[in-house]
Amino acid sequence: MKKNILLVGPVLTRSGYGEQARFALRSLRSQPDLFDVYIKPLTWGETSWLIEDTPERRWIDETIEKTIGYIQQGGKFDISLQVTIPNEFENLAAKNIGYTAGIETTIAAPEWINSCNQMDSVIVVSNHSKNVLESSKFEGVDDKTNERIFLENTTSINVVNYPVKTFDNLPKLNLQLDTEFNFLTVAQMGHRKNLNTTIKCFIEEFHDENVGLVVKTNLAKNSLIDRNTCKANIKSVIDSLNVENRKCKVYLLHGNMTDEEMHALYVDENINAMVAIPHGEGYGLPIFEAAYSGLPVISVGWSGQCDFLYDKQMPPKPHFYEVAFDIRPVPQEALWAGVIVEQSGWAYAREESTKQQMRQCFDDIRNNNEDSYALKSCERAAELSKAFSKEKMYGDFVNLVTDAKKLQDVQEEVEDLLNDLL
């Protein structure tokens, strides 16, 4: 019998959580015999909404209308799947599942732990998020009873990574780059993505060379005002370095790009490598997309991106240019009440190491150095495409929603009891 499942999330927004909500939706739709899907769309900050007219978008619109009518008639749900940050989780159905990107720092907020504990289970996008949620513990004293209070995670937390995306035809981009070698970085402007340091390290290392850095970014939306603000911010970083007679170039790439256009960017003949030194990632989707598209990656080996930048063997084997880093406190201006708490830390890429790894990647590509990460990037892309296939990730996600493993364990226990009786 089909389960009525309500998906709550920013499914129509161009955001990380929007991408996450659409992955959840596609996973549920891959098993039409198991679920009757309903959708409650959320906004996500000031991010833009999807504007493409696709069969999926039309189906989402129809399902939202169906959901409104169903709720107005008093309809109930067997399962709610809530794609958002944990402090927004609610009791909406007989069974409630939280699906969150988790945390990009060393500690989860106590509000998050408390909210996760109200869920029947929680799904996260990376082992980093799982580990932080499970290891964050708090204690205090009850103001009324003076008794010590302990708070830690008590709910089941499981990981499902994102799948690779494949396209039959990718558009040709007219990037108009006049530098011979080009790095790419894809990052929203803000403290966490560490974009200013990325630009600074690039210019200081390649200031007198014919090398470019393509910066795909925005602040929140894809408007002209947003573009002008991004342009001014980048110019401010460049001007602060006081580099005269600079030959290297920084290109601003701004505006709405479809999935096909983004993947065309990763494989464009003018793009040679991906550089990303964020302070922390729940998963690091642009880094993942670049890696499975065959781009060499320069990054830090901490937080969500570790799930695909390293092998799962022990000890983990890196498949990227590792930038050294230090874990230090999150600055005051990046704290977010109920989300990023004061005692948390995140990674700070060492600037000299960033320059060294960018240089090493540059040299490996220019000199065709054997056994380098750069020359093995396409081989690694093939491995990722197999390990993170759409079919596997959809299946893993559906199994967690349906408690397939728990059901299998019960069935095995019943079979064991029957065998004992016989």
Model-derived segments and spans:
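Extended catalytic core of nucleotide-activated donor transferases of GT-like folds
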Residues: 6-8, 46-132
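Donor nucleotide-sugar binding/catalytic pocket of nucleotide-sugar-dependent glycosyltransferases
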Residues: 121-169
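N-terminal pre-catalytic "stem/leader" segment of glycosyltransferase-like enzymes
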Residues: 1-76, 212, 395, 422
